[in-house]
Regions:
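Conserved Class I SAM-dependent methyltransferase catalytic core
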Residues: 238-239, 304-363
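Flexible, glycine-/basic-rich loop-and-beta segments that form/coincide
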Residues: 369-452
C-alpha cells in the first residue's frame, strides 16, 4: 500500500515546485514557521489534488473522503486509514476543526422582512415532517454517511534535495505539530524537518563513502540524504516510534536504510563508519520538568545536564573508521564564573581530551537561561499548556540552571575526524571558533576546516588568496594610513575579519607564487620589522584565515 501512496503523490504532482506555484512566498514562509493559516486561506476552494493533500496533511484540515479519493485515486481514503495515516471523524469534529469562515447573514429572515413592510413576498411556513410508518419496537437503521470527513493523523509533505549526485524529490512523514493539533507535543513526538535539521543537512560532508550512520534518526531525513552518497546506511534511535517512521519514509521513498532501535551507539557496537551525523536530543532538561511535563524524546536524552554531548563525543571514535568524520549539533553549559566569549570552550575541550580525533568546534550563539527555557518550552507547545503547569515548568527549569551555576548555554556544532594510529600518537588537534558570522558552513567548508588542522608547515606553504576576498580600509580624514583593515569573504563562510597591516600584506601577496616564509621576509624588510616579530604577528591569524577558506594551498 505504501507503493500505491507513492504512485499517487507522484501522479498528483505534489512536489515542492507545485507548492511554489500554489502558494505565495508569504504563505510558504509562514509554513516554515509552522504557521498554516496563510496557506489555508490561499488554498481555499482550490480543487487540484496537490491543494487537497496540502490542506489535509500540512494544513491539518479535514477533507471529505471523496476529495481524498480524487487526490489519491489508487490508494483512496480507505487506504489512508489502513496505513494509519488518517481517520474518519464525525460532522461535529470536522466543523470544529475547519478554520475557513462560514457564510453568515445578519439580516432578518425573508418572511419577517416582508411582514415588516419591506415589499418582499412572504415565504410559506415549512411543512411538518411526515409521520413515520416504522414499528416503534423496530431497531432504527444505522445512519449511513455517504461521504464522511477524514482527518490526518500524521504530517506528510514533499521535500526537495539538491545534492552533488543529483536532485531528489521525497515525501516525509512525521508527527503533527502543535500548530496543526492545537495541543502541546506528546512525549513520543517525532519531529519533522525543522531549522536545526536543515542546518545539519546543509553542513554535512557529501563525499561518496562506503558506510554512514545517523544517530537519533527521528523521521529519517538525515538517513535519506546519507543514502544518496553512502553504500550502506544505518539509522538508530531510542524511540520505537521514530524508528517506525524512518522505516516508513524509507519505504515511501524506495530507499534502503538499516533501522535499529537503541540508545546512541549501542545498536552498532563493534561496527565502524566513514561518516556519522547526529542531531541528538541535547536539550538540557531538569528532572523536575521531566516529572511534571514528561520527557520529550525528540529533544531530551534523559541524561543529567549536558552530559549527553559528552557521551556522544566520547563514544564516537570507537565507531569511526580512520579518516572518518562525525558531525553533530550540540549545546553546552557555560558556568557563570567563566567568560562566555573567551572561556566558553573549556568544557568541550575537557570532553575531547585524550580522544584520537581532530576537532572543529563552533559556538554560533549563546542564550541566557531564561531565553533558553523560553525557546524550548515554546518549541513543545508550552503556551498551549494549562497556565499553572506552564509556569511551574518554566520556573523549575530556571531554578535548576540557577542551582547549577549556569551563566549561559552555548549552541553550536562539532566536527571530528578520526585519526589513524600514526596521527593519534602525536595527539589530536582542535580549533574553537566563536560566532561564525556570515553563512552557515556547507559540507565542503567543514571538510576543509578539518583538513586544515593537518595542513603542511605554514612557512613552507604556497598560499593562494580566494578570488572572492576583498579588503575594506577605514581612514581618519587626512591620515595617510588606514586605522582599520577588514577582509571580506564573498563566498564560503561569508566572514568579515579585522586584520593587521602585516596580515593584510601577506594575504595580498598570496597569489600562488611565493611561500609564506618568503612573503613574511619581504614584509619584514619593507616595514623595517624583525622577521620573527612578523611571524609571531601573522601566524595565528593566517591559520584562522586558512581554516575559514580565505586562503588555500
Amino acid at each position: 500500500m505504501i507503493a500505491r501512496l507513492r504512485a499517487d503523490v507522484i501522479a498528483s504532482s505534489w512536489t515542492t515546485d507545485t507548492l511554489d506555484e500554489l502558494l505565495s512566498d508569504g504563505a510558504l514562509s509562514a509554513l516554515m514557521r509552522d504557521s498554516r493559516l496563510p496557506a489555508l486561506v490561499e488554498l481555499a476552494g482550490v480543487d487540484a489534488p496537490a491543494a487537497t493533500l496540502t490542506r489535509f496533511f500540512i494544513g491539518g484540515q479535514p477533507e471529505r473522503a471523496s476529495a481524498l479519493d480524487a487526490a489519491l485515486p489508487t490508494l483512496g481514503a480507505a487506504g489512508l486509514e489502513t496505513l494509519g495515516l488518517a481517520a474518519t471523524i464525525d460532522e461535529d469534529e470536522a466543523a470544529s476543526a475547519l478554520v475557513m469562515p462560514r457564510p453568515c447573514s445578519k439580516s432578518a429572515p425573508k418572511r419577517e422582512r416582508a411582514q415588516a413592510g419591506e415589499g418582499e413576498e412572504a415565504s410559506f411556513p415549512t411543512a411538518p415532517a411526515l409521520p413515520t410508518m416504522r414499528d416503534p419496537d423496530e431497531e432504527p437503521e444505522p445512519e449511513v454517511v455517504v461521504d464522511p470527513w477524514m482527518r490526518a493523523l500524521y504530517d506528510l509533505r514533499p521535500h526537495a534535495a539538491a545534492l552533488p549526485g543529483g536532485e531528489h524529490e521525497w515525501w516525509v512523514t512525521s508527527d503533527l505539530g502543535e500548530g496543526q493539533t492545537g495541543k502541546p507535543l506528546a512525549d513520543h513526538h517525532v519531529m519533522g524537518i525543522g531549522g536545526a535539521t536543515r542546518t545539519l543537512l546543509e553542513m554535512t560532508v557529501r563525499d561518496q563513502v562506503d558506510s554512514a550512520l545517523d544517530v537519533g534518526c527521528g523521521c529519517g531525513i538525515q538517513a535519506l540524504y546519507l543514502a544518496t552518497h553512502a553504500r550502506r546506511v544505518v539509522a538508530t534511535d531510542v524511540s520505537a516510534r521514530a524508528c517506525a517512521l524512518t522505516q516508513f519514509n524509507a519505504a515511501l521513498n524506495e530507499t534502503t536504510i538499516d533501522v535499529r532501535e537503541g540508545s546512541l551507539f549501542e545498536p552498532v557496537e563493534g561496527e565502524t563508519f566513514d561518516l556519522i551525523v547526529t542531531n541528538p536530543p541535547f536539550v538540557i532538561t531538569p528532572d523536575t520538568v521531566r516529572c511534571a511535563s514528561g520527557m520529550h524524546e525528540y529533544r531530551d536524552g534523559g541524561m543529567d545536564r549536558d552530559n549527553l554531548i559528552a557521551a556522544v563525543l566520547r563514544g564516537a571514535p570507537d565507531c569511526m573508521t580512520p579518516g572518518g568524520t562525525l558531525q553533530m549539533l550540540a549545546n553546552w553549559e557555560i558556568p557563570a564564573s567563566r567568560n562566555p566569549d573567551t572561556q566558553w570552550s573549556q568544557r568541550v575541550d575537557e570532553w575531547l581530551d585524550g580522544l584520537p580525533v581532530d576537532a572543529w568546534v563552533v559556538q554560533r550563539d549563546v542564550l541566557d537561561p531564561a531565553r533558553y527555557v523560553d525557546m524550548w518550552i515554546r518549541d513543545s507547545g508550552g503556551p498551549l499548556m494549562v497556565r499553572a503547569d506552564y509556569e511551574r515548568a518554566y520556573t523549575s527549569w530556571l531554578v535548576d540552571f540557577r542551582r547549577a551555576g549556569t551563566g549561559v548555554i552555548g549552541m553550536g556544532f562539532v566536527a571530528l575526524r578520526r585519526l589513524d594510529e600514526a596521527e593519534a600518537a602525536s595527539g589530536g588537534r582542535r580549533a574553537f571558533d566563536l560566532s561564525l558570522d556570515g553563512h552557515a558552513p556547507r559540507g565542503h567548508d567543514v571538510s576543509w576546516a578539518l583538513a586544515s588542522l593537518r595542513g603542511p608547515e605554514l612557512w613552507d606553504t604556497v598560499l593562494t588568496r580566494a578570488s572572492d576576498v576583498r579588503e575594506e580600509r577605514h581612514y581618519v580624514p587626512g591620515s595617510p594610513d588606514p586605522e582599520l583593515l577588514i577582509l571580506h569573504q564573498g563566498g564560503g563562510l561569508g566572514r568579515s575579519v579585522p586584520v593587521s597591516s602585516a596580515v593584510s600584506a601577506v594575504v595580498g601577496a598570496s597569489d600562488g607564487e611565493l611561500t609564506v616564509g618568503q612573503i613574511v621576509a619581504a614584509v619584514a624588510m619593507l616595514t623595517s620589522v624583525e622577521a620573527d616579530d612578523v611571524r609571531a604577528e601573522v601566524e595565528a591569524p593566517l591559520r584562522d584565515l586558512i581554516r575559514w577558506g580565505f586562503l588555500t594551498y
